[in-house]
A protein has these predicted regions:
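Long, charge-dense low-complexity segments
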Residues: 2-29, 34, 38-41, 90-94, ...
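Glutamate identity and glutamate-enriched acidic tracts
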Residues: 20, 28-31, 73, 77, ...
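N-terminal core-binding DNA-recognition domain of tyrosine recombinases/integrases
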Residues: 21, 34-137
């Protein structure tokens, strides 16, 4: 029996999984989700299509003039803010494997010429993910490996993706 100042415990909050809420985004970005998922599989790195849909939805949610223009700052914002905000607004769990999915998605964009030529080169975009704990293979960095020097918010003055692709670097 509860005393006069005691209240019964609140029921636990149960958040839906990403799979339970991502359906509309998968439909909206169907072509990109299918193409990226197939590309990842062909690279020997199968990926959950829901993670690709989440990236696409988070990019689309932010008002951007050019969704194909990628910079280190944009990758950092997507990873640290946009994906988390999308999950918060959808009231679902934020997936732990988003860094690896973004690594693969950026590779897909570069390999299929879907990066704006003015984008930072793929390796510089992936620096943000190295800073966030991935190794050079796009998988979590093993324990004991040195941290990656963060330059996510420093101005980038090197060649663009277009210059790298054209061999003009």
């Amino acid at each position: 029996m509860l005393g006069p100042s005691q209240h019964p415990p609140a029921p636990p909050v149960v958040l839906p999984t990403l799979a339970e809420v991502i359906g509309p985004a998968r439909r909206e970005h169907h072509e990109t989700v299918v193409d990226a998922t197939q590309w990842c599989h062909a690279q020997g790195r199968p990926i959950d299509p829901d993670l690709i849909a989440l990236i696409c939805a988070a990019v689309a949610q932010r008002d951007r003039d050019d969704p194909d223009l990628w910079t280190r700052e944009r990758v950092s914002e997507l990873l640290s803010c946009d994906v988390r905000n999308w999950c918060s607004m959808a009231r679902c769990w934020h997936p732990d494997s988003q860094r690896e999915a973004l690594w693969l998605f950026l590779g897909f964009l570069a390999a299929t010429d879907r990066l704006d030529p003015a984008s930072h080169p793929l390796d510089r975009l992936r620096d943000v993910l190295r800073c966030a704990g991935l190794g050079d293979d796009g998988r979590p960095r093993p324990e004991g490996m040195p941290d990656f020097r963060c330059e996510c918010h420093r101005p980038y003055c090197g060649p663009t993706q277009g210059e790298v692709s054209a061999g003009l670097e």
